[in-house]
Amino acid sequence: MSKIPSVNIKELLDAGVHFGHKTSRWNPKMASYIYGERDDVHIIDLRQSAALMSVALNTIYETVKKDGKILFVSTKIQASDIIAEYAEKCGQYYVNHRWLGGMLTNWKTIAGSIEKLNKLEKTLENEEALMGYTKKEILDMSRKKEKLLLSLAGIRNLNSKPDLLVVIDTNKEHIAINEAVKLNVPIVAVVDTNSNPDNVNYPIPGNDDSIRSIRLYCSLFADAALQGLEESMKASGVDMGAMQEHTDKALTSKNVSKLKQAKKFSKTKNIDEETNTEFEQALNDADENKNSDNA
């Protein structure tokens, strides 16, 4: 049986997941996920982050295991390349530049843009066909292709709505979240102290600005998806030695099992004493290291 990835408080702390925003920028709806404040910065409760990350990773695993499709979304500069890297690694879909309004709710228009992209690529790859165009026309086509690729490269093989949306920065990606809600697509999202966790089915309290934090999240998400893909392949009788060759096939699969929307998973309860001690000790160690560096 595949092993779903996990993360501990020390790993989250080392990646800076506990650092929220300035206390003046907080969203009161995040109060239950905040441990305290230090130097006018909110500290996120990593005990909850670890527990809720586990729930999110299991959701990703189960979605892919059932041949579901996941759409990763983050268009902020810090996350753009990382999102694409890990989505491609696990054979899933992504939007890492501008979210085009209607990407989910007006798929017919988006599909038309994808078809336009495919035609442009086909024309530009045909040397004989290009002989009928001027240099300026070819340059214009190349520019149009690159512009379309920025927005559509990660979803060009997505032929139906995703079964799960995974978001980093709910404030910036609020349009994507609203569209997912309209279509009853469940949402996994990293929520910082200035975020609104409403409409997020599987919130993960954490820093959504740090590159180290974002890379950790995406690595865990991709590993969970790959484990789900492995289980799906096994169930289909696929030779696991040839699993990599089947990743592209998973991208274009039309036989998707729709993931039933789960109820919102709110504040974790009954965190054990060992976890409390681990978190407090990790914070104290971090403070001591900071003080020794400043001495």
Curated annotation (Swiss-Prot):
The keyword Transport does not apply. CDD domains: RPS2. InterPro entries: Ribosomal_uS2, Ribosomal_uS2_bac/mit/plastid, Ribosomal_uS2_CS, Ribosomal_uS2_flav_dom_sf. GO terms for cellular component: cytosolic small ribosomal subunit. PROSITE patterns: RIBOSOMAL_S2_1, RIBOSOMAL_S2_2. Pfam families: Ribosomal_S2. Residues 260-295 are annotated as: Disordered. Keywords: Ribonucleoprotein, Ribosomal protein. The keyword Ribonucleoprotein applies. GO terms for molecular function: structural constituent of ribosome. One of its GO terms (biological process) is translation. Belongs to the universal ribosomal protein uS2 family. This is Small ribosomal subunit protein uS2. It comes from Rickettsia felis (strain ATCC VR-1525 / URRWXCal2) (Rickettsia azadi). The gene is rpsB.
